[in-house]
Design a protein with these regions (language model features):
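Short, Lys/Arg-enriched N-terminal segments with co-localized hydrophobic residues
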Residues: 11-21
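Gly/Ser/Thr/Pro-rich low-complexity, intrinsically disordered segments
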Residues: 39-270
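Short hydrophobic targeting helices and cationic amphipathic motifs
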Residues: 4-6, 12-13
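Sec-dependent signal peptide recognition
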Residues: 22-30
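Hydrophobic h-region of N-terminal signal peptides that target proteins for export
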Residues: 31-38
Length: 270
């Protein structure tokens, strides 16, 4: 219909219009991405320090808190899990992406080490006094999606209303800068959640890195494209790290059974 007024026009005169249309459609995803209109997407970032070094990789899923929400899916037990894997847990939920969740103990049940809230129900209490559970990411209440220090929640008389919550740590980035004093010796797979301080968020997993290396990477200007990391929290990693994305069909399972998962789902419109 757009070319109806050109009926009868020679093909060679129509060609520029068609070429421009095709070019626009090819560039549309990039235009939307850089304009911030894309609400959710999966991207892969790589870097290489030296000629003989391994290529480091980040699998990251970006989303907005005004269009998407966090869901927690708990296995109930690592011995007799309800789902058995991140992939199965996400597919049985309205999630478009997900990662493994918080730390858990080595007992038969895999008791969570820190706060866990699923569908508004608190499954595990807030933990205190540990570097590994220094932060909480939660969904719900007046502030919507929030990443906060555990010590701040601890000082509250009552915890805010939460639909979903996972406790983790340590913080990797605060106020846009890499946190100092992070471990620089142990390299392993890492899982994290980050925000730009506004409505833009991401979850991700990394190749084998130290906490210090991951923090420095996330805090570096342009490390995640036009997403500037204001705050980032480490979640359970190592053999627990897992990443799943419905859009791209990517599924990186954990090497062992984990206790819970953190998923991203579209906001339910009423």
């Amino acid at each position: 219909r757009a070319f109806r007024h050109l009926r009868g026009t020679p093909d060679f005169l129509l060609f520029p219009h068609r070429l421009l249309t095709m070019l626009f459609l090819r560039l549309l995803p990039l235009i939307l991405c850089f304009s911030g209109l894309v609400h959710a997407e999966h991207r892969v970032f790589t870097r290489k320090d030296g000629f003989l070094s391994m290529r480091d990789k980040l699998n990251v899923y970006f989303f907005r808190s005004d269009t998407h929400r966090l869901l927690v899916r708990d296995e109930g037990s690592v011995k007799t899990p309800r789902y058995g894997s991140l992939d199965k847990a996400m597919r049985k939920s309205p999630c478009v992406a997900g990662v493994n969740g918080g730390f858990f103990s080595a007992d038969a049940e895999g008791t969570p080490l820190g706060l866990v809230v699923q569908d508004g129900k608190r499954l595990s209490p807030l933990a205190t006094g540990s570097f590994a559970v220094s932060g909480v990411v939660y969904e719900g209440g007046r502030d919507g999606l929030t990443l906060i220090r555990s010590s701040v929640l601890r000082r509250m008389r009552r915890l805010p209303a939460m639909q979903a919550a996972i406790q983790g740590g340590p913080f990797l980035v605060e106020n846009g800068s890499a946190v100092k004093g992070l471990n620089a010796q142990k390299s392993t797979y890492r899982t994290f959640i980050a925000t730009d301080g506004g409505r833009r968020w991401c979850i991700g997993v990394s190749s084998s890195l130290t906490l210090k290396e991951l923090a420095a990477w996330l805090a570096a200007p342009g490390a995640l494209g036009n997403f500037r990391v204001e705050t980032a929290l480490n979640l359970d990693g190592g053999s627990s790290s897992a990443f799943w994305c419905h859009e791209t069909g990517i599924s990186y399972p954990a090497f062992k059974q984990v206790r819970n998962y953190l998923g991203v789902a579209p906001v339910e419109r009423r």
